Amino acid sequence: MRVLQLAYGDLMKCSDIPIAYTPAGGYGPTFPPLILGNCTEPLVEGAPDLRGIWKVITATRAGETVAPDDRLMSYTERIEQCGNRIVDCGGGTIADARADGTEENGVHDVSVFDYTTPIHVVASYEDGIFVLRPVGLPGIE
């Protein structure tokens, strides 16, 4: 029934799509299938359109240019957006959140460094900027 409704113009909202999480050990060398690919809900007011594939072109660390053979220089991520939801796949992890400023709807997944350490991050759109605030780090509000 849902497919027929969509064929006749009904919106597929971001809330209709289950939250995605990083699989054990990360998703591997290729991106997983699109998570929000069937979502037709427009982006919320004030959300910057960040959808697409993003690749590091240049980077600095501690004020120094990162060497071309540093693994950071091969980092690529894919961002999907729908409604107030944003999904960032990169480094083997999936960060899926509603950018509504609440801890409840933030990212609850694992760190890219070991695929086991829990991370909790509040996501929001503020003045046209995508803002991430890790939970439990003093001085980050």
Summary of predicted features, one role per range:
Residues 53, 83-85, 129:
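Structural motif
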Residues 1, 57-63, 89-141:
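Contiguous, well-ordered beta-strand patches that form the walls/edges
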